[in-house]
Amino acid sequence: LTPLQKQDALLDGVVLEETGLLPEAELTGDTVSPAAEMELDGVQQLDETTYYAPQDGGRITLTIAQPVADCETAFVVQGMQYTATSPLDAMSEEELSAMSAHDRRNLQKQYAHFWRKDSVYLRLLSNIGEGRIEYNRPNSQYYCGRHDFVYNFGTSDEPLQQITIVLPFAGYYQFDRLAVECQKLDTVAARAENLGAENLQNVTLGTNSLGGEITTTRSSVLVVQLPYSTGWSVTV
């Protein structure tokens, strides 16, 4: 499941380390991924997952055929990888010769160490907002093996109709998946209310203790939200 789908699923149940203790919850999620038409500007699609931008600033635009209104909207990127190339490689001898010696030297100096780029970002432009996704390459000191990302545009009555991904640098970009996901808000309130129908009553708080009473109609899991801190333990 993607992060938005996981968020949606937690309105139907809870994740347990041990399985088989309770029946599995039936997922009734309202998260959808609307179909989108892709348009490329300054970008070549080499295969199903690989895109080549010969110059800085290439664009990939996704237009949603049937936009989803009144929802929480996220842009999902899975399996991202980036290999830097020099924009000089995409220039012909005629183009280079047409430049002045001064401009040519400046350009060569600008891209002398293009292959050393340790990070790259995706700039997101849409009709409901803008965003940015940072990707650290394996040669970065901040690299942590992360290749999947989600940018959350939040909730809005207005549907996302179009999103443009700006590729800032020349190079090869790989994406296993580029998609818009929308969690509809129609049933969120009712599902949240259902989760809290049987809750802890007469709560008492003490030093290292929390007490209360609860009546359930079936075997259930009691979820208690506590501020995170190291050193916590629970005895029931």
Task: Give the residues covered by each predicted segment.
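Active-site-proximal, structured, solvent-exposed surfaces of multi-pass membrane proteins
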Residues: 1, 5-236
